[in-house]
């Protein structure tokens, strides 16, 4: 790990709100299902506004983009703020499409799959809309776009790169790779998923919400890369908080018994370091 990466990871994982200070641009992106989406965009401070640069399209999980309580309510939550800081510090622009607010939701986590009005199909439409929007942006390097998704957003990334879907295979602007943190892989496994582009998965050994087993099998089936982080639960890369039991989540390995979520202060920074290394290797 380089000295610069160490500095930024310490900053992000211990004092993310003090470190975070970039200007956030607000945009409207049209999903391919015609929904107008809010989107937040951050650029590296060190680059000219018109200078082409790599872009990360960051896909939030079932809890949405924002903090829901405290003084930072309505702002990027710590995980997204920390990732924005990490990416922009290393020369990447990062785009956060908000799939929930204009559809009247703030979170899906406590909803059963069968009752959710926002489906993975809506969210993959949002990815397609974001890619179409990026095609029109002169600062976006079309050859260096990566999808990054957590949990529900990770599953969205899987659907968004599945070569079995015609819209994926025929895109004009094709992402370079997809990187996912603890996605749900069971549906992709059943649907004979075929990645159009390279796929890397960051998985939590003890995850009882979206268990690593199906993702490991999926990776072996399709030749994807994966990393399993020991002694880690869902949301282990969150830069704040501690492991807790969420009894309000009905979907998990043990329905009705809740799921464990929360930060691992050792493996979380390791995974974000691996993310940076993966991005660099992608474009060597």
Name these PLM-found stretches.
Residues 11-21:
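Hydrophobic h-region of N-terminal signal peptides that target proteins for export
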Residues 22-51:
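N-terminal cap/lid segment of alpha/beta-hydrolase-fold proteins
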Residues 37-38, 52-136, 240-241, 246-261:
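Serine-hydrolase catalytic machinery in alpha/beta-hydrolase-like enzymes
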Residues 65, 72, 118-195:
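Primarily recognizes the serine-hydrolase "nucleophile elbow" in alpha/beta-hydrolase
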Residues 195, 201-203:
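Short beta-strand/loop motif that positions the catalytic acidic residue
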Residues 206-210, 234-235:
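Acidic catalytic loop of the alpha/beta-hydrolase fold
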Residues 210-220, 241:
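Short alpha-helix in the alpha/beta-hydrolase fold that links the catalytic acid
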Residues 224-284:
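C-terminal catalytic histidine-bearing segment of alpha/beta-hydrolase fold enzymes
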């Amino acid at each position: 790990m380089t000295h610069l990466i160490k500095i930024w990871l310490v900053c992000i994982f211990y004092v993310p709100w003090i470190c975070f200070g970039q200007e956030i641009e607000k945009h409207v992106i049209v999903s391919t299902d015609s929904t107008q989406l809010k989107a937040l965009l951050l650029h590296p401070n060190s680059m000219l506004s018109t200078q082409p640069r790599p872009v990360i399209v960051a896909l939030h999980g079932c809890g949405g983009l924002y903090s829901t309580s405290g003084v930072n309510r309505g702002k990027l939550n710590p995980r997204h703020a920390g990732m924005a800081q990490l990416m922009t510090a290393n020369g990447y622009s990062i785009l956060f499409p908000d799939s929930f607010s204009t559809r009247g939701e703030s979170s899906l986590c406590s909803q059963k799959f069968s009752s959710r009005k926002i489906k993975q199909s809506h969210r993959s439409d949002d990815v397609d809309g974001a890619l179409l929007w990026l095609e029109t942006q002169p600062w976006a390097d079309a050859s260096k776009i990566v999808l990054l998704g957590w949990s529900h957003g990770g599953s969205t990334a899987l659907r968004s790169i599945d070569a079995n879907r015609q819209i994926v295979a025929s895109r004009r602007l094709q992402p370079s790779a997809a990187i996912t943190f603890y996605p749900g892989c069971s549906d992709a496994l059943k649907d004979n998923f075929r990645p159009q582009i390279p796929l890397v998965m960051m998985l939590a050994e003890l995850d009882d919400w979206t268990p690593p087993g199906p993702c490991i099998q999926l990776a072996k089936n399709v030749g994807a890369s994966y990393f399993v982080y020991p002694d880690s639960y869902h949301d282990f890369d969150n830069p704040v908080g501690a492991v807790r039991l969420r009894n309000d989540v009905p979907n998990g390995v043990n329905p009705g018994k809740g799921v464990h979520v929360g930060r691992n202060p050792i493996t979380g920074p390791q995974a974000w370091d691996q993310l940076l290394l993966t991005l660099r290797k992608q474009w060597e």
